[in-house]
């Protein structure tokens, strides 16, 4: 597994941590692949009952790594296989909890919405900041967000 994603076990709980604090845990291609691999391993492990997805150093996830996109190393965007943020197309049989501190914006919001439950710090920030650059939520986030909080509140974001 990559150093950009850490997976740790404590009994039946698997904690998956996005570990790119200098980039506010923005997800590049390597990190997306590592996230997908971590959740595949969690799903296949019969002794794991629940997963917690979090980010290192007080940041959940600032979305896709725009610097990597600018350098031609953007996330995988294809109609099949893993999603651009890694596990966002997976249908797991076990619950995943998002433990959100700091920013969960753009693709980070999509990751949080993909989880079955979200637990947020008092100062957590959720947002669709990608719309500022004309980039939509691209991997089910629009549908998940409106189902979670309703269309009116989703439009406010």
Language-model features, listed with the residues they occupy:
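An acidic, glycine-rich surface segment that forms the CoA-thioester-binding/catalytic face
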Residues: 32-36, 40, 44, 66-101
